Structure formats: structure tokens, C-alpha cells
Amino acid sequence: MNSQGSAQKAGTLLLLLISNLLFCQNVQPLPICSAGDCQTSLRELFDRVVILSHYIHTLYTDMFIEFDKQYVQDREFMVKVINDCPTSSLATPEDKEQALKVPPEVLLNLILSLVQSSSDPLFQLITGVGGIQEAPEYILSRAKEIEEQNKQLLEGVEKIISQAYPEAKGNGIYFVWSQLPSLQGVDEESKILSLRNTIRCLRRDSHKVDNFLKVLRCQIAHQNNC
């Protein structure tokens, strides 16, 4: 493995270690608004949602790795689960350069759509993981934590839109995950395949949200001075 690959792996392991430490000690990102009073500056709002989105993505990564360790033992099984994600039909920037070309208010509403669209599959993930044999509390607890933190993230993105681009409020794309398979009455392997794909796609979307918010924080809150 080259030095760059080693550094990336070390960085991922460090993030997972921090995530586990924070989770076990019940240390969470600051709330977006305290006691319903939101006088937070735009810059601070961006700082908080970026920390929160990164925390959520780290929890997804942690859960995905743990799910594979628990249930996926061979590569043939993993190949079966590589399907398109439900949000693949949403036109999203592929990298930072493309993201910078998208009007900020459009990108914010796209982020909002991705965060909103995760609610139903997250709920199904929680009920689905609880229904498989020997379901580890470790995975279930992280799914529930993500569900709660997602509500905070949604609130934060909505506050940013209201402050920075009030005219764009309500212009988001209402996107629903279609073809969410029923997990009732299916065999154990099919259930695991479905749940793994759900986690993979949610993790993919959370990575997009995290990256887009970092681009927007630099662009809006720091006037591209970062």
C-alpha cells in the first residue's frame, strides 16, 4: 500500500475511533438552536451543520463496516448487493469543481432533499436491523443516533436557507425513496442484502451532503477565503 493509501486508512480509523469515543460518552455536536431561540450567526450555523454532517457520515461509515464484519463473509455476497441507489436519479455535482458551479441556493435545496429523503429508509433500517437474527445492539444504536442527528441537520439547513436565501425557501425537490423493499416474509440472506444496500446508499448520500456543506461554508460563510 502506498503512503497516500496508508494515510487515508489511518484517517478513517481515527475518525471511527473518535466517533466511538463520542458515542460511548454520549458527547454530541452542539444543537443547532438552543431552547428554540435561534440567534446564531450564519457563519456559526455553517460551522455547526458541517460538524454535524461529518459526525453523521462517520456514524454511517462505522455502521457499514460493522455490518459487513457481522454479516458479510465473502466477496461474492458483496457483489450481489451493488445496485443503483434510489437517489442516483438526482442530478448532483460529482466533485468540488462542479459543486462550485451550482448556485448556492440550488445546492442548499439539493442538500435539503437528500437529508429529507433519508427519513423513510432510516426508519426501515431501524426496524429491519431489529428483525434479523442476532441483531447487534451496536448497529441498531447507531441507526437510532443517526435518525436523531438527522433531525438536527435538517433544522440547520432550513435555518441557513431562511437566513441566506429566504426567497429560495420551499424550492427543494421533494424526493421519496422508491422501491424500498418489504422485509416481511423474506429469507435472511435477502433481508441482509437489502439492509446492506440501504446502509451503503444512505452513507453515499451523507458523504455528498457533508462535502456540499463544506463547499458552501467556504463559499458563503468565509467568502471563498478557505
UniProtKB/Swiss-Prot annotation:
<keyword id="KW-0597">Phosphoprotein</keyword>
<dbReference type="GO" id="GO:0042711">
    <property type="term" value="P:maternal behavior"/>
</dbReference>
<dbReference type="Pfam" id="PF00103">
    <property type="entry name" value="Hormone_1"/>
</dbReference>
<dbReference type="GO" id="GO:0005576">
    <property type="term" value="C:extracellular region"/>
</dbReference>
<feature type="disulfide bond">
    <location>
        <begin position="33"/>
        <end position="38"/>
    </location>
</feature>
<feature type="modified residue" description="Phosphoserine">
    <location>
        <position position="117"/>
    </location>
</feature>
<dbReference type="GO" id="GO:0005179">
    <property type="term" value="F:hormone activity"/>
</dbReference>
<dbReference type="GO" id="GO:0046427">
    <property type="term" value="P:positive regulation of receptor signaling pathway via JAK-STAT"/>
</dbReference>
<dbReference type="GO" id="GO:0050673">
    <property type="term" value="P:epithelial cell proliferation"/>
</dbReference>
<dbReference type="InterPro" id="IPR009079">
    <property type="entry name" value="4_helix_cytokine-like_core"/>
</dbReference>
<keyword id="KW-0732">Signal</keyword>
<dbReference type="GO" id="GO:0050679">
    <property type="term" value="P:positive regulation of epithelial cell proliferation"/>
</dbReference>
<comment type="function">
    <text>Prolactin acts primarily on the mammary gland by promoting lactation.</text>
</comment>
<feature type="modified residue" description="Phosphoserine">
    <location>
        <position position="53"/>
    </location>
</feature>
<feature type="disulfide bond">
    <location>
        <begin position="85"/>
        <end position="201"/>
    </location>
</feature>
<comment type="subunit">
    <text>Interacts with PRLR.</text>
</comment>
<dbReference type="GO" id="GO:0008284">
    <property type="term" value="P:positive regulation of cell population proliferation"/>
</dbReference>
<comment type="similarity">
    <text>Belongs to the somatotropin/prolactin family.</text>
</comment>
<dbReference type="GO" id="GO:0030141">
    <property type="term" value="C:secretory granule"/>
</dbReference>
<keyword id="KW-0421">Lactation</keyword>
<protein>
    <recommendedName>
        <fullName>Prolactin</fullName>
    </recommendedName>
</protein>
<dbReference type="GO" id="GO:0005148">
    <property type="term" value="F:prolactin receptor binding"/>
</dbReference>
<dbReference type="GO" id="GO:0046425">
    <property type="term" value="P:regulation of receptor signaling pathway via JAK-STAT"/>
</dbReference>
<dbReference type="InterPro" id="IPR018116">
    <property type="entry name" value="Somatotropin_CS"/>
</dbReference>
<dbReference type="GO" id="GO:0008283">
    <property type="term" value="P:cell population proliferation"/>
</dbReference>
<keyword id="KW-1015">Disulfide bond</keyword>
<keyword id="KW-0964">Secreted</keyword>
<dbReference type="GO" id="GO:0030879">
    <property type="term" value="P:mammary gland development"/>
</dbReference>
<dbReference type="GO" id="GO:0007595">
    <property type="term" value="P:lactation"/>
</dbReference>
<feature type="disulfide bond">
    <location>
        <begin position="218"/>
        <end position="226"/>
    </location>
</feature>
<feature type="signal peptide">
    <location>
        <begin position="1"/>
        <end position="29"/>
    </location>
</feature>
<dbReference type="InterPro" id="IPR001400">
    <property type="entry name" value="Somatotropin/Prolactin"/>
</dbReference>
<keyword id="KW-0372">Hormone</keyword>
